[in-house]
């Protein structure tokens, strides 16, 4: 799908998370690495994409913000930050002897088990379950990510973004989310 611009150059009408996609937005746009010191009090926050910073700070953002919408198309593997279970597994004699056995497959199983124990709602669990067949798996660490996503003021939006206007984000399912600030992860 494309539209013609004035100078006959075709531009994709699909949201690509590039700087041009945010030109109409009048609010503030933050990079995910600017989250630590920012005050989100009484703001409608949109998080576009997922990285270690957004996973780590989502609970803090939810505590301060009026409403948080997390736009995430592809779910990732979330491991507990405390890693008590992982430490026990690593010190097991069979794993300690053959360190190479502790690879992405084992971490994937641990991440899926963590998801299973942390998320109660079946549909949300399905939306957050990553594809275990993917060859390049991304692992993030957080003890509170799943808890934050289940808060009353937080919504996981898995439909693709259609456009960003001056005060809102529209997704493909027709939902309009009013937004005061956008946290953008770099693709």
Where are the predicted features?
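Core beta-strand elements of the Rossmann-like FAD/NAD(P) dinucleotide-binding domain
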Residues: 1-5, 39-41, 172-181
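Feature captures the FAD/FMN-dependent oxidoreductase FAD-binding
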Residues: 1-12, 137-138, 145-155, 163-164
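Flexible loop residues that form catalytic
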Residues: 4, 73, 187
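Rossmann-like dinucleotide-binding core of oxidoreductases
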Residues: 10-122, 134, 154, 175
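Extended hydrophobic/aromatic segments used for targeting, binding, or gating
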Residues: 26-29, 168-170, 174-187
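Helix-loop-beta segment of a Rossmann-like dinucleotide-binding subdomain
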Residues: 125-136
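A conserved short coil-to-beta-strand element within the FAD-binding core of flavoproteins
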Residues: 132, 151-172
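Mobile, glycine/GP-rich and aromatic-enriched active-site lid/loop segments adjacent to catalytic centers
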Residues: 147, 152-158, 177-180, 186
